[in-house]
Amino acid sequence: MLLHIALILGCWSVFSEGAETDVAERADGRRPIWNMGHMVNGIWQIDQFVDLGVNSIEFDINFDKNGKPVYTYHGVPCDCFRSCLNWEYFGEFLTALRHRTTPGDKLYKEKLILFVFDMKTNSLYDNQAYQAGVNMATDIFKYYWNNGQNGGRAYFILSIPNLNHYDLIKGFRETITKKGHPELMEKVGYDFSANDNIPDVEKAYGKVGVTDHVWQSDGITNCIARGLSRVKEAVKERDSGGVINKVYIWTIDKFSSTRDALDAGVDGIMTNYPYVLNDVLKEGAYKNKFRMATYEDNPWVTFKA
């Protein structure tokens, strides 16, 4: 009897939270924006970037020859005016993320709500993608989700640099399901990050049955200028009801480029200087149209103005 009541209350809580989220989004009417700290590969940088004003961070995952994620690291070259050499062992980094996204933990950071796992799978053969997904899921389940017991609450994006590595998604999804926690996949989204043609990206998702939870990235290092034509194409596909739910751009560090990206309709801006986006969001032309996303904003729901 007590178990039955607990299950009812648990389900009510989940549906109630979703209803509150929908009401909040309708009530505000501004597009939620994810301020995405770029290349956060050291544990100490997590706190640094949150203190600088991000609600999301991106980090680079390197694999060994067997497709096992080993450490966070970008290496040379990287963005201009940044240190390229910070790194941590993957398990230790995930544990640090869990502490900072678990309510009640002494290290908890309420505003940190989304991660981007920039997976450097180009070092792998195409036929290793599935196993890489299995290995990613195994480590994330253990170190971040605490084996399914009160793990971190953040959403995250598996960002893949190669369209031929779509089976990574399948390996990840099947592993979490086999561990008896398919509900955790509600926290997981996807991105192909190599600036491929949008129709080709959609075909890759189709091969593994992905129809939602999709963020589409576009960008280049801050050392080089890049136009917004592909961003606008992705935004158009998003707004037409296609597989894309959100669009983000990287790496944007200038005030003018930040304004241009917001004008183009992006949902997220990846940056080395979070204060730039935060300052722009306070400007008269933007403060009534955009706001910083919170945990109550579902990152897999396409915003409707």
Curated annotation (Swiss-Prot):
Molecular function via GO: lyase activity; metal ion binding; phospholipase activity; phosphoric diester hydrolase activity; toxin activity
Secretion signal, residue range per the UniProt entry: 1-18
Positions of Mg(2+) binding: 58, 60, 118
Cofactor mode of binding and number, as noted: Binds 1 Mg(2+) ion per subunit.
GO biological process, one term: venom-mediated edema in another organism
A GO cellular component annotation in the UniProt record: extracellular region
Active site: 38, 74 (nucleophile)
Location within or outside the cell: Secreted
UniProt enzyme class: lyase
Listed InterPro entries: PLC-like_Pdiesterase_TIM-brl
Cofactor(s) listed in the protein's UniProt record: Mg(2+)
Tissue and organ expression note: Expressed by the venom gland.
Entry keywords, A to Z: Cytolysis, Dermonecrotic toxin, Disulfide bond, Hemolysis, Lipid degradation, Lipid metabolism, Lyase, Magnesium, Metal-binding, Secreted, Signal, Toxin, Zymogen
Disulfide bonds: 78-84, 80-223
Propeptide, residue positions: 19-26
The enzyme's E.C. designation: 4.6.1.-
Gene3D superfamilies: Phosphatidylinositol (PI) phosphodiesterase
Catalytic activity as recorded in UniProt: an N-(acyl)-sphingosylphosphocholine = an N-(acyl)-sphingosyl-1,3-cyclic phosphate + choline; an N-(acyl)-sphingosylphosphoethanolamine = an N-(acyl)-sphingosyl-1,3-cyclic phosphate + ethanolamine; a 1-acyl-sn-glycero-3-phosphocholine = a 1-acyl-sn-glycero-2,3-cyclic phosphate + choline; a 1-acyl-sn-glycero-3-phosphoethanolamine = a 1-acyl-sn-glycero-2,3-cyclic phosphate + ethanolamine
Family affiliation: Belongs to the arthropod phospholipase D family. Class II subfamily. Class IIa sub-subfamily.
Function: Dermonecrotic toxins cleave the phosphodiester linkage between the phosphate and headgroup of certain phospholipids (sphingolipid and lysolipid substrates), forming an alcohol (often choline) and a cyclic phosphate. This toxin acts on sphingomyelin (SM) wih high activity. It may also act on ceramide phosphoethanolamine (CPE), lysophosphatidylcholine (LPC) and lysophosphatidylethanolamine (LPE), but not on lysophosphatidylserine (LPS), and lysophosphatidylglycerol (LPG). It acts by transphosphatidylation, releasing exclusively cyclic phosphate products as second products.
Protein name as it appears in the record: Dermonecrotic toxin LiSicTox-alphaII1
Species of origin: Loxosceles intermedia (Brown spider)
